[in-house]
Curated annotation (Swiss-Prot):
It comes from the Bacteria. This is Large ribosomal subunit protein bL25. Belongs to the bacterial ribosomal protein bL25 family. CTC subfamily. Keywords: Ribonucleoprotein, Ribosomal protein, RNA-binding, rRNA-binding. GO terms for biological process: translation. One of its GO terms (cellular component) is cytosolic large ribosomal subunit. PANTHER family: RIBOSOMAL PROTEIN L25/GLN-TRNA SYNTHETASE, ANTI-CODON-BINDING DOMAIN-CONTAINING PROTEIN, RIBOSOMAL PROTEIN L25_GLN-TRNA SYNTHETASE, ANTI-CODON-BINDING DOMAIN-CONTAINING PROTEIN.
Amino acid sequence: MDIIKLNATRREDSGKSASSRLRRAGQIPAIAYGRELAPQSVAISPKALLQVLGSDHGKNSVVELAIENGQTLTVMVRDYDYHPISRELVHADFIQVKLDQPVDVQIPFRCVGKPKGVVTGGVLQQIFRTIPVRCLPEKIPSFIEIDVTELDLGDSYKASGLKLPEGVKTLLADDQTIAVVNAPEKAGPEEEAKPAAGAPAAGAAAAPAAGAAAPAKGAAPAADKKDKK
């Protein structure tokens, strides 16, 4: 993983008024802290932070926070906030990391391929959206994926089957299911009796299509047809 450089200026003032002045100047307040680092109040460019969040590793990127006084901190994004209406970044937290010490992070997880069981009518259930792992900061993968093509009805994929890069260890138990192909649920009596969306309720005649001839007086209504499952 490449380390991303992010410039910052030291921030002396705090509070809503100071934060508003920062934002008007094109900056947002941020704070950097760690186990061996006292909280450092800084200001950063929201555009620069968006570039970090939009990179391959996103929130898991390793950042070199260069403060104007010559101090440089190796950090990762711990959290960030958006304005509820404008959806613009308004604040960020950074946590200090050391390149020779492992970190615990959540990695985006995805399934690829169409399972055999889905072809025959089953449903793929992906249990996790992210996978917790432990590794050195520069070893953090951008994503984890599994090929589920061979999964049949009732088959599951366990955490023990994950193929992770060297030096990366999942924090899930080996027998933890991360994806499974379930048989389709059978509709109960009430669900079968319930009309489909857009269908006329029982006893109600459907409106004729535009231009269709009206049924002859006294003619029997057409028999209902069940939807094919």
